[in-house]
């Protein structure tokens, strides 16, 4: 296995048992690698992330995370036991929770919760927003919060599904710089789904077209 974090072997998916949305995908992502998955709308990019996260069941094939098979023909490991994080385009923050409580939602039983939240608030430069609710902060601040929340449990693999597509160019570039610095500091393994080749080149070392794997 070497230092691989994720291995996909002959992974296929079908929503209705007839129309194939993903067909025999094989891919390896190594520790601290930053990979972008490119492809046109409807090519299955988001579905691929949902399969890895355990939110969809594959038609066939194997998903291995940190040397452990989490999905094959015989069993399916629950999403919360896969040690992966997923950030989606719509941010999916809990509207009734503050920024601080959103970030801490997935680590409520962690004894180091207070320190982890404090460190992430500082890292993403949102300490001053800790008591604010999602509707009280900007789109960029919401996205910072969403990424911080996904990193709170220290996932081995952080997956980003078109996370900046709703933001303007200036804000995107600001977040690119911040996120690259954070990823480097934490040696975080990243899988980014995007249709934007320029974004992929800025945020990843390896750009892969889904139609070619």
Residue ranges and their predicted role:
Residues 53:
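Helix-to-loop junction immediately C-terminal to a conserved catalytic motif
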Residues 70-85, 109:
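ABC ATPase NBD coupling module
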Residues 133-137, 141-143:
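Conserved ABC ATPase signature
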Residues 152-156:
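A short, proline-enriched helix->beta-strand linker immediately N-terminal to the Walker B motif
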Residues 71, 111-130, 180-181:
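Conserved ABC ATPase "signature" region
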Residues 187-193:
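Conserved H-loop
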Residues 61-72:
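Conserved ABC transporter NBD signature motif
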């Amino acid at each position: 296995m070497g230092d691989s974090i994720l291995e996909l072997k002959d992974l296929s998916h079908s929503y209705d048992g007839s129309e194939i949305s993903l067909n025999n995908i094989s891919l390896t992502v190594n520790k601290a690698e930053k990979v972008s998955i490119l492809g046109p709308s409807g090519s299955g990019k988001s579905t691929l992330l949902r399969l890895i996260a355990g939110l969809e069941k594959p038609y066939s094939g194997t998903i291995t995370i940190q040397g452990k098979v989490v999905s094959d023909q015989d069993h399916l490991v629950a999403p919360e036991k896969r040690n992966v994080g997923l950030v989606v385009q719509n941010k999916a923050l809990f509207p009734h929770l503050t920024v601080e409580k959103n970030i801490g939602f997935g680590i409520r039983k962690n004894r180091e919760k207070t320190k982890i939240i404090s460190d992430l608030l500082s890292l993403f430069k949102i300490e001053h927003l800790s008591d604010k609710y999602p509707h009280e902060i900007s789109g960029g601040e919401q996205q910072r919060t969403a990424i911080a929340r996904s990193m709170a449990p220290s996932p081995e693999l952080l997956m980003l599904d078109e996370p900046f597509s709703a933001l303007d160019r200036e804000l995107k570039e600001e977040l690119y710089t911040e996120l690259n610095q954070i990823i480097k500091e934490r040696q975080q393994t990243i899988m980014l789904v995007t249709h934007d080749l320029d974004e992929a080149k800025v945020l990843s070392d390896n750009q892969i077209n889904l139609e070619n794997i």
